[in-house]
Amino acid sequence: MNIGLFTETYYPEINGVANSVYMLKTELEEIGHNVYVFTTTTPGAPEFEHNVFRVPSLPCILITERRVGLFYQPKLASLIKKLNLDLIHTHTEFSLGIFGRIMAKELKIPTVHTYHTIYEDYTHYLTHRKLLDKRAKAFVRVFTKICCNTAEQVIVPTEKVRELLLKYSVFREISVIPTGVNLKKFNPDLHLKEDVLKLREEFGIKPDDKVLLYLGRISKEKNIGEIIEAMPEYMRERNQVKFVIVGGGPEMEHLKQLTADMNMMDKIIFTGPKPWDNIGLYYQLGDVFVSASQSETQGLTYIEAMAAGLPVVAKKDKCLDDILEPGWNGYDFTDRDELFKGLDAIFFNNNGISYGENAKLRMRKYSSEEFAKNVEMVYEEVMQRDFISEQRAAYETKKINHLFHT
């Protein structure tokens, strides 16, 4: 098959969507498909990339680290028409997603759409008043429904997201396919003990320290502040515990100030963002992965952490249902007391449970190979259907015009 992937974010950017699309391209090519990626310009992108086409872009208002491609590119459209695409798979609701659907209409080929991001959790970046935020969330729900209903098939990473789209009145068939990870990349056996100890020493972590680790985007919706605010109480009688935060984002300075105000800078360590190619080593800084986020569609960092042999202690969320088995590969929590009990059970393990080994075992079904095979099955099913591009285009045009003129 000749497959076009349209995305607003791609390697070398570090985020769940970029990783997912990069991995999908890699694995589909391994199977034998021809895969073309259409994405945005981004700082640090390689000069030469096989079958990757980049369009001029601007920073995204909703998620400032992301970029949005400039709308319809005639030269790129001409090139796409020569590629003999069989199917277009969009990974964005914004300009490149719309561009992908326009091209699918012109080429009379089907569109599959993956819904990666729960945008209702990001509207606070645009609005600072409750009424405005309520309206923004309503707009997001309608816009999401339109984007999903104009595809022949929708893919989501978890049942949590499928249920959300059904509430939005998405009527297209929805397939739940967890995004996989390159399990080999996070294998702890790849890293020498000496290298891990050296990295821990670089950040002032002693060999016998017990380390909570958060790795990912540092932003309001990730709710890292809840963990930070609990640390003075938790560490009061547990002097050997440290909390390491790896990553960057708009909340970084605020959380650093919060940490300084609590006089915890020696216990809570911010490493800043780190290169994706070396991220497996940074997971080895931790003894347990911790998160209070409830904005995840799937939580790829949970999967990466478990693949790296780290048990997870995370705030209870439906996206964890298939990943976390409390008491076996980690714990969930709803309040501070449950957070502390979960951490203590892992740090001071007196029950003989091999949390880290169990975490690795659980992740076998989340391999990138399995992910690509499941997506390929969706492609094959969609290709066998009869569909009428004109009907889809009419629906899209009508709904988008209505959305922007009411």
Regions found by a protein language model. Give the residues of each.
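N-terminal subdomain of nucleotide-sugar transferases
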Residues: M1-P56, E376, Q391, E396-T406
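Carbohydrate-associated surface elements
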Residues: T41, K160, G180
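Nucleotide-activated donor-binding/catalytic signature segment of Leloir-type glycosyltransferases, i.e.
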Residues: H254-K274
